[in-house]
Amino acid sequence: MKKSIILYSLFFIFFSSNTAAIANEDYVKYVNPLIGTDTSFELSNGNTYPAIARPWGMNFWTPQTGKMGDGWVYTYKANHLVGFKQTHQPSPWINDYAAFSLMPSVGKLSVLENERKLKFSHDNEIVEPHFYSVILDEINTKVEFTVTDRSSFFKFNFPKSENSNIIIDAFFKDSEIKVIPDENKIIGIAKNNSGGVPENFANYFLIEFNRPFKKSGVW
């Protein structure tokens, strides 16, 4: 009887210790959101984009190398970024729904994609399921963002400059932007879609800044 009790006790202790070790394991570190992004229209190697999001989150965020309306939002071989995009895209073939993007700028303001795009290197990029960071060397600016179930937090680390800007691109198809400078807020509606939506389909968003605007405008 004593031997049975001792063996049972040892097994129980071993099992309990092993369970605690598993519970404390950080499985997020094993996830690489870049898997499947080395792809193109001509050759599919996954057709994915690095989705920074909570599980079942309302919105996904992703760095953007493709042009507005291009289903290949982020391709690993690209060396320029045109924005950081809130996306609801299920696949490149279906394209996106109710999307808009943010993009920092320093110096002369250019809002068009081909003019505002900036070089980046994967060596200066951190991509995790819950966090993204990249250094844009051309303007000496670091961009970081993380997400919640329904919102996101961005941090733009600009150099000392009298002309640092954040461009908000609400895409097309009757989308709207309104600047509220007295409250450091911008509100907007993104309606872009690829069909199959109700007549009142829209994504209503609010962006709040921690610093006042020196100037603002829409185009």
Regions found by a protein language model. Give the residues of each.
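Positively charged n-region of N-terminal signal peptides that target proteins for export
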Residues: M1-S4
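Bacterial N-terminal signal peptides
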Residues: Y8-S16
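Sec/Tat signal peptide C-region and signal peptidase I cleavage site
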Residues: N18-I22
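Accessory carbohydrate-recognition regions in carbohydrate-active enzymes
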Residues: A23-W219
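General helical structural elements
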Residues: I6-L7, M58
